[in-house]
């Protein structure tokens, strides 16, 4: 599934989901810091659990996901790139 944030006929951001896994979240560079990422994350928080992978060095993204209630569950080396990455998860407060 893909959720798109569009305004004035212009796609400004989108989030791609594979069941409860966030495959990607992108906000156009000129539209960052305007709450678009928050709105997209809020849309998929209907799910009980969400997970994603993010590079450890992408400190802006890590901080964004932490602010949205995600926590680091695991740290690993990504096989193809050799980069350190985090598995981050979000649990709905209403579930165990």
Regions found by a protein language model. Give the residues of each.
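Terminal substrate-recognition subdomain of acyl/acetyltransferases
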Residues: 86-96
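Conserved GNAT acetyl-CoA-binding A-motif
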Residues: 41, 46-58
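Conserved active-site alpha-helix within GNAT-family acetyltransferase domains
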Residues: 38-39, 57-86
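Conserved GNAT-family N-acetyltransferase fold
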Residues: 3, 15, 20, 25
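A short, internal acetyl-CoA/4′-phosphopantetheine-binding micro-motif in the GNAT/acyltransferase core
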Residues: 22-32, 54-55
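Conserved beta-hairpin
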Residues: 1-13
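Conserved acetyl-CoA pyrophosphate-binding loop and the N-cap/start of the following alpha-helix
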Residues: 31, 35-43
């Amino acid at each position: 599934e893909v959720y798109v944030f569009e305004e004035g006929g212009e796609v400004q951001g989108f989030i791609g989901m594979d069941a409860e896994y966030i495959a990607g979240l992108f906000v156009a560079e000129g539209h960052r810091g305007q709450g678009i990422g928050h709105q997209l994350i809020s849309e998929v928080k209907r799910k009980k659990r969400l997970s994603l992978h993010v590079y450890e060095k992408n400190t802006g993204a890590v901080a964004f996901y932490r602010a949205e209630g995600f926590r680091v569950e695991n740290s690993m080396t990504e096989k193809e790139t050799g980069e350190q990455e985090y598995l981050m998860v979000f649990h709905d407060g209403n579930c165990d």
